[in-house]
Amino acid sequence: MKHIYWFILLLPVVIGACQANKPTSTSTVEGPLTEAQQRLPENAVRGLKTREGLETTLFASEPAIMNPTNMDIDEKGRVWITEAYNYRNELNPGHPYKQAGDRIMILEDLDGDGKSDTAKVFYQDTCINAALGICVLGNKVIVSCSPNVFIFTDTDGDDKADKKELLFRGIGGIQHDHAIHAFTFGPDGKLYFNFGNAGDSILDRNGNVIKDAEGRLIANKGMPYRQGMIFRCNLDGSDLEVMAHNFRNNYEVAVDAFGNMWQSDNDDDGNRAVRINYILEHGNYGYTDEVTGAGWSSRRMNMEDSIPYRHWHLNDPGVVPNLLQTGAGSPTGMVVYEGDLLPPVFRNQMIHGEPGHNVVRAYPVKKQGGGYTAAIENILESSTDQWFRPSDVGVAPDGSLFVADWYDPGVGGHQVADLDRGRIFRVAPAGSKYKVSPPVLNTAADAVTALKNPNLSTRYLAWTKLHNMGASAEKELVNLYHSNNPRYRARALWLLSKLPNGADYIKTALRDKDEDIRITAIRAATEAGVTYGNMLVTDPSPAVRRQALLAMYHSHEADMPANWALLAAQYDGKDRWYLEALGIGADSNWAACFDAWRKLPPNKQHPEADNDIIWRARTPAALPLLAALIQREENDPMQNKRYFRAFDFYPAKESTPVLLGLLKGHHPKQDYINALAFMQLDAGALPRTGEMAKLLHNALQVFKDRTEFIDLVRKYKLRDQNETLLQTILNKPANEIQGYAMKTLLECGGQPLVVKRLQGKDTAAAFILVEAMGKAQDRPNRELLTALIRNKVYPAPLRELAARNLGRGWDGYADLWSLVERKLLPADLDTVTKDVLTHAWRQDVKAKAVAYYEPAVVNKALPPVEKLLAIKGDIPNGKKVFASYCSSCHLAGNTGVNFGPALSEIGSKLTKSAIYEAIIHPDAGISFGFEGYFFQLKDGSQVLGYIASQTDEEIDVRMAGGQGVKLRKTNIASRKAYEHSLMPTGLATAMSQQELVDLVEYLASLKK
């Protein structure tokens, strides 16, 4: 879920026989429910709100099943479930472990009342512990469980796995929610699946490295693929393709009849950037920097103004836009509903589980240019029960919707809470019986009927039957192709395209009046290797032209550049989907495409379109044109950052001469242009001349008091700017800028200036400088703080502040404790130092300090969470407690520091009990992306924090308090995972019981 962000811990439940207790879905309790009553299966539906016109019934629940992670529904209407009892046990060592392993369950309704009558164990073993995906294809079941993908086969029809085979292996993310997800059967007869950014790499069943058709390694190595990926392959795993990449945790890909791919992707916790994606084949979706692999928070030219958009590098050329951004959340399973039992608003649309918001919803789309827009329509949501956590959705053969509910108090990290619960719901029109008859597949006509079914498993059987029949099924498929339903027509076309005369059907479909059929035909032609020349370059539909561009990806056809140019000439300057399709189509052939395009007349109707194509291009021929755009006097150079950013996507040997040339311009705002050029240039490439020094000095004035000023001073080692740096610090800019400026000042030899101010009469200035040193936290600043603490010449308040600021970082805590341990701490600082060290987030230092200063409270115990929940908290006081204990690392609204996960909507995501658990036991639920790492540097210093970004040359580490430090990899002696959460253990005991209750009350009130 958002990782999945389920918290499980399940008591062993043994179902020895196939019979299961039929769930009772009718509550017998009148009036409001107690907490205990609300958890009972018979009250499950009472806590939910269903879309008008639909009815939700409880199909199955505990004890028959527990913690469903993924679900599929077979052609008989049976529900298959992967469970996760053995979930993240290494992170939760106190929880029981089922030695027999986790289970695959089959649930069946025998009498059509919409409630499961039997629960069978299909397979149980530790090799599928906490599996994240299941796909039922006839007598074969594909199960996704990193590091493997298994195919289980029931050879004798007894609903037991008789054979286990590997499909893929070597996938990262063992016991991780960002790992391999569910497979699905596509309308083209291929398998589609994805993994999140813990998947990392994939090997074939024999352990061999897999490369794409171009010979490129399929792995998160930036050659070219990064982070999470979508894949397509044959049923036997051969011909693996990367369909798109650079996602964070793309959870489950859904494929419609036309071959369109849809999925969700979640953000780094708390950044309100969850997204829904429409997939352009071979697209880059921007989670990390395409070239360097740097994270989204790393500063770059033309950085997006808001974090939700910055999160996906949406201002960068080469990043496909998002269909929809839905704020915070924990997205899980998705399906395209191609049935007609549900109301029209849900038909042919994505349906999706969002446990972070306790909702199942659809995203109805409308075509717009080369892409889509989307809205949100809820189907099923929590009304009173915040434990409702939909982990997957599926469509039954009768068209009803099934929802798997993980059922847990929280979604966040790898912590687990509930021991034995899990539910399956059925959503259908009120009074709708659940009657399913297995498909009859004796004839082609039978199979065509089954091919129309909304259930994927049924369609797989139909597709396989028709495909195996070959030409003998042609007549029935042609009849289906001429039906009035575009999705039936598309399914028929896919099969017709695979016949010996399939090229004829494809070429006919390319001229069809329905643009979706034309798009399907393009995809079928690409798979079949059918060429069609310039047939589509003047197609009236921008969506068809978009697909024609995507089909040009790595094409070797002689007329491809000319056709690409004609399609480029029709770009309107507004449609980002179309622009990115142009970029994908020209990939590996930019020089020829760009040359062909430049030979065409300029786009007088949409002149901005030509500028965008230059910006998106990846050929040296575009660089002089980029420079010309920057130098146009009618352009506001303040808006030229997007053009300067484009230089980052070229090798320095190509971009440097053009950037140096920009320094010689005569624009009315030339200093600003020069400033941006200096930002983009490599310092070693700059001629060291007096003229260049003057240009650089003038450029600095453009960025005075801004981060870019410090960047330039540090980049070019400008010691003559130390006074200005000092003044920047004293102007009290934002936290990160102030620490960065202080670090840069000392790097540039500015320590004498700092000491002079500390010894001066301006007390306010001295206090500001000490705060800045604490934010910097590098060795020179810590040494300066230590010297200040020990020197009684300085006034006591300043030295107290120095002690507090030394105790803000990993090494700083050690330095301060060392003064205590070695009896070097002046006695008048004992009280403040005790306060700092006994509240330290560095565990080893805190333990020593508490034992030294407060031995009586070492074993202070809190009452059980159940008792804390019964105490009423005070929200206003909880806000004050947050400011005292939490705001140095967390944001809540506009208050606090952006270090740990933002808590602005935490009350929508976690129940009170889950919030208590997260505070009391932080090690049990570390959010993905916030895992700590301990770095030992070659100079002897140490750094602890989480990795915000990483490139081939350096690692950007965020330390407690929100300060960042960039570590050159060549300066790192060792790196190892930190075994604890960066959130300090014992925080709950550092405050009073009532303060803890008030804090939780406040956090629980923070909702969307």
For each predicted feature, which ranges?
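Positively charged n-region of N-terminal signal peptides that target proteins for export
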Residues: 1-5
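C-terminal motif of bacterial Sec signal peptides marking the signal peptidase cleavage site
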Residues: 16-17
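Beta-propeller domains with acidic blade repeats across secreted/periplasmic ectodomains
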Residues: 22-446, 465-468, 894, 968-970, ...
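C-terminal capping alpha-helices of c-type cytochrome domains
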Residues: 59, 139-140, 148, 191, ...
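Sec-exported extracytoplasmic/periplasmic mature domains
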Residues: 154, 569, 587, 807, ...
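Sequence context surrounding c-type heme c attachment/ligation sites in exported
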Residues: 397, 404, 873-887, 894-917, ...
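Long, ordered, helix-rich scaffold segments
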Residues: 404, 420, 427-881, 899, ...
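C-type cytochrome heme c attachment motif
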Residues: 423, 495, 880-894, 901-921, ...
